[in-house]
Amino acid sequence: MFATLVDEIQSLDDHGVTARLRELELERRRGDAETLALITLATSRGVHRSDGHLSVAGWLRANLNWSGAQVAAAKKAARLVDSHESVGDALVDGHIGASQVGELARSARNPRCGSEIGEVLDLLLDHAEQLPYDDFRRVVRRWESLADEDGAALDADASETNRTVSAHEVDGGLDLR
């Protein structure tokens, strides 16, 4: 089968190879968008239960033979496109790819600043479309650091504030917890 496929594309000239590659990438992006839409629909309907699974994650692993990492990434991306339709539109239209959606989804799940991503999403989508992926990733990470300037310090302060200690005498010694 693969040999037949290779034989079919051998006749393409250099321009044809590039054109076909771009065509396939657009198809992949549309397919990724539809997959995320199906995951969202399946989640809201509880399709996994009718298929005998306890969770959407189990349903995805069983039906698609996905790894745990793939399942987690897809669920994050599905939540993002469900709550921010413009991301799904950009993906289905082929303006951005799965990597850009994944980076936005990761950022949207940041517990300290992810809820603010909607305020800058249009700008981030422009960057996702225009910049090479590594540059786009730096832009998103920079936005996170600016939106969460005190985040790490606040976590450290909360940890310190919430610390407790108790001392108990045990067998003539002191047990600190």
Region locations from a protein language model:
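Conserved C-terminal region and hinge/linker of Rieske [2Fe-2S] proteins, especially
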Residues: M1-R177
